[in-house]
Amino acid sequence: VCGEWTLDLGGGRQVLLANVGPGHTGHDLAVLVPGEVEVVFCGDLVEESGEPQAGPDAVPAHWPAALDRLLELGGADARYVPGHGAVVDAAFVRAQRDALAARFGVSR
């Protein structure tokens, strides 16, 4: 997926697939499920059960920006489903974004 793509699931239900840029990998995707409360599936860009892991295909300098994009997709009231661990809120994603920026020496 390059950019964003809307997937029609039928029955009037659609989801948005979004390439949020490199971070955990070179091609991180998120899925936004619109609803009364937005739900964003984050993959391993967000990890609740421990510190996010950066493997050899990670792009640390861009990871915080990918999390900013996740927050833009879902908004302040969304629920974020991480690749590992329990569902989190926007405050958790922001805190993880700031921790990764500090860890990898990335400024705003």
What are these regions (language model features)?
Residues 1-18:
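Short, conserved active-site entrance elements at the starts or edges of catalytic domains
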Residues 2, 63, 107-108:
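Proteins with a high burden of low-complexity, intrinsically disordered sequence enriched in S/T/G/P/A and R
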Residues 6, 18-95:
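Metallo-beta-lactamase
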